[in-house]
Amino acid sequence: QMCIRDRIYFDFSGYSDMAIGLGKMFGFEFNMNFNYPYVSKSITEFWRRWHISLSSWFRDYVYIPLGGNRVSKIKHIRNLLIVWFLTGLWHGAAWNFVAWGLYYGVILIIEKYLLSPVLDRLPDVVRHIYSIVLVVIGWVLFFSSSFGQAADYIRVMFGAGAHGFADRESMYLLTSNLILWLILIFGSTPLVHFRYEHMLRSKKWNTTIINSVVYAALFIVCIAYLVTETYNPFLYFRF
């Protein structure tokens, strides 16, 4: 499930960035759609960083017209449940998408009215683990075809499956691709971006040459992968 977590992030964030880049080529400026969501320390923060365009649309055209948070507690809870029910339904008229949306709606309500003071007192690493675990469970609901399948995945995640946390095949695949997985985890954090920006701001480096070399290298690598790949559509193209 951690691999699914990374796949959907790089899949969706990747083609969102491609759209932003293509827009720039034609003189259009598009807002960032993903802001390193997997560094979040709460689900509330996660949804400020994940699929920002969708969250902003539902906020502006559904949540605020319903009264937003300028209403009573009961009505605010109602507003959140309506927004997240519709967010799930936006992805498809299937139980798993609706359950996924309501799952996040309930968590956001609990964080707002119960957990927020508790989370604020916890160490950052604990809050981060809390966020990642809930997000991964969310992806289980999103991709499962039945409640039974979702329950089986969640049991295995917590070591309650027939083979514990993973069977031999899963462990083989994990160890065989461990370096790639670590690169993906590292790439989903802002560390590379911050380091690159720091280097560009340093007077020791010629930013024009650095940008040209980096972009050319990335372009060559991308073309090489495209040439060797078969047809592999983006996961989010169906939404």
Where are these regions (language model features)?
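Membrane-embedded transmembrane alpha-helical bundles that form the catalytic cores
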Residues: 1, 5-238
